[in-house]
UniProtKB/Swiss-Prot annotation:
Residues 1-23 are annotated as: Disordered. Pfam families: FWWh (PF14922). Belongs to the FAM227 family. InterPro entries: FAM227. Residues 7-16 have a biased composition (Basic residues). This is Protein FAM227B. The lineage of its organism: Eukaryota, Metazoa, Chordata, Craniata, Vertebrata.
């Protein structure tokens, strides 16, 4: 009993035992179980071969080897961009190599005083350059009436020029400015109106209407109409979808105005022919071509082209129109200078002395005949009128 008590006293004095910590790794666990000798004591045949294989496995399973293998064999999304970048670098080096061998501009041209003057002159021309205007004075020897103009014939690969050297671009600009469009809208419409297809439409439409009204020629009219339709399709396809509706609401009216202005500019002496009926027929035709519908009657009343009777599209004043007396005098002068009054020749070949007359002169001849008939007896008037139409 005494021995037990002494042991209890010793144990109480020693205090509680410290608990052993659990193993934290596989090596500690093996050591704790007294298995630390395994598998080091296991011996395989051909130890060198196994160690080499193990080394290869370790190398092949490393991060670097896996990344390299994937980089070389797996297709990448940005591979095309990388190839392009490398090619651009290569080409930039080639370009730098070539540019380094080119002479500098200053070493090729000596900076003399004459060169400086030439440079200043070039800058002056760029600053003050304007498009050349062709303005026809009334003294120029060009035909100013319908009778003196003729269509030279349709050419498949070439537009027929407008009469009296008129410029289609100038005519379109004149029409656009008359509409007083906003500056931004004007710039947009200007690019479309001055396009190649729109210029072709004005040329061919003018000549088609000229032939239709004054010189009927079915073959040339058909050729012109075919090209008009092709040009219209080209223009239609060239207009962006966002502007198409707005543009083709104004285009037929502007084209009709441009054709009307061209007739006024080309034939100022025949301006009396370009009356309200002329404008109505012209507009109806152009609108039917472009939209398939006729415009409202009297649509031309909003046209701001009244000044064309006295002023050209360039702003210069026109010569005053000839009076009826002046037209009669011109007609009589033409008759006296072109008709041979040798009665024997006339009787032998009467058809050779029949002259083609204009609508203007035919109207004047009717006017003079009616005036003479009212002053003479019926028999004399009848003979006189028959004589006038015989000679004319």
């Amino acid at each position: 009993m005494a021995g037990q008590r002494t042991c209890q006293k010793k144990s109480s004095r020693a205090g509680p035992k410290k608990m052993q910590e659990p193993p934290k790794s596989i090596e500690e666990f093996l050591k704790f179980q007294n298995w630390d000798y395994w598998p080091r004591e296991i011996h395989f045949r051909d130890d060198d071969e196994w160690s080499c294989t193990l080394k290869k496995i370790k190398e092949d399973s490393s991060f670097v080897s896996i990344y390299t293998h994937l980089w070389e064999n797996v297709p990448r999304i940005f591979e095309a961009l990388l190839i392009m970048e490398s090619k651009l670098k290569e080409y930039s080096l080639i370009l730098q190599n070539h540019t380094s061998k080119i002479f500098k501009w200053k070493s090729m041209i000596s900076e003399t005083s004459s060169y400086r003057k030439l440079e200043r002159y070039g800058e002056f021309l760029k600053k003050y350059h304007k498009k050349k205007k062709i303005m026809l004075s009334d003294e120029m020897e060009t035909e100013k009436n319908i009778e003196g103009c003729s269509f030279t014939g349709f050419k498949a690969n070439e537009l027929t020029k407008l009469p009296r050297h008129l410029d289609a671009e100038r005519i379109y600009l004149f029409i656009l400015k008359a509409h007083n469009f906003d500056e931004r809208v004007f710039k947009i419409w200007k690019t479309h109106f001055l396009s190649e297809a729109s210029i072709a439409l004005l040329h061919d439409s003018f000549w088609w209407w000229f032939l239709h009204k004054f010189r009927p020629d079915r073959e040339n009219q058909d050729c012109l109409f075919d090209r008009i339709s092709e040009s219209y399709v080209t223009l239609f396809m060239s207009i962006p979808l966002s502007r198409k509706d707005a543009f083709f609401q104004i285009y037929p009216d502007c084209l009709a105005q441009a054709i009307y202005a061209t007739f006024h500019e080309a034939f100022p002496e025949s301006s009396y022919l370009f009356n309200d009926e002329f404008k109505e027929d012209l507009g109806n035709t152009i609108f039917l071509w472009c939209s398939g519908l006729k415009p409202q009657k009297g649509f031309w009343t909003h046209w701001k082209l009244k000044e064309l009777s006295t002023t050209t599209i360039h702003g210069s004043k026109k010569a005053p129109a000839k009076s009826v007396k002046e037209r009669i005098a011109d007609s009589q002068e033409r008759i006296t200078t072109t008709i041979d009054f040798n009665i024997i020749k006339i009787l032998n070949n009467p058809r050779a002395y029949v002259l083609p007359i204009s609508k203007e002169e035919s109207g004047l001849s009717r006017l003079t005949t009616k005036t003479a008939s009212s002053l003479l007896c019926p028999h004399m008037a009848e003979r006189m009128s028959s004589g006038i139409f015989f000679f004319l």
